[in-house]
Amino acid sequence: MAHGLGGTKDSGLEPFARAFAAAGLEVLLFDYRGFGGSGGEPRQVVSLDGQLEDYEAALQAAADLPGVDPSRLVLWGISLAGGHVLRAAADRDDIAAVVSVVPMVDGLAAALHATASHTPGELLRSTARGIRGRLVSRSGRAPVMMPVVARPGEVGALTLPGALEDYLSIAGPTWRNEIAAEVTLELGTRKPAAAAARVDAPLLVQIADFDQSAPPQAAAKAAFKGRAEVRHYPCDHFDLFPGKPWHDAARDHAVAFLVRHLASTKVTADA
């Protein structure tokens, strides 16, 4: 299990993990390189390929734990990581189930989706910051940073009304509200939805129907390609996190899905 864009494992994920552990599943919850409790330099820099490698490393680490059946691994990801898990599970025969929560699965669709809730000026400022960040990183200098979440009208990766307050409500002690700006350029080039058709394991996709951050239509298309079980929630992107109206339902649906497909898994937890 891992978080989305700029997230850390102590920021709203532990309640999901503890629910899975209580249901008899073994849980390995991790931070990406350069974030939270994980090592790596530079800090707060998102590499989509690097995060995918981190998922693959976590799968190997989980498979090596005592008592774990290495042929029955599960992937869980939320937001940006909801796309990572599709890519990580594709073309593997050791994955027993996948849970993709409010997933970001199509960068171009997300960019078009953003035009409905952001002014052209806001989008231009974020893109300009990303371009400057890319140029600076290629020169070998320290990354250009931007907030993960900010208020509407400010520069940030997520600037929708309420996004700052929503993220702060789940933020753990290791979370930092900054991220390397060049990720804004990388996001638009990725389409993990294409990997959904190559996921052979049972797949649960949990969609927030009024999601202003991750396009729900793109998530639904990916779910169809992956022959997924789909759960819809009449809410926005952050409303499936702990303390929000639809968290309990999303958590319980995921638990039921995993128990149904992993009924023989034994109990331990490392959250």
Walk through the language-model features, giving the residues of each.
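Conserved alpha/beta-hydrolase "acid-adjacent" motif
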Residues: Q212-A218
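Catalytic nucleophile-loop/oxyanion-hole region of alpha/beta-hydrolase
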Residues: T8-G12, F35-P70, V74, K244-A249
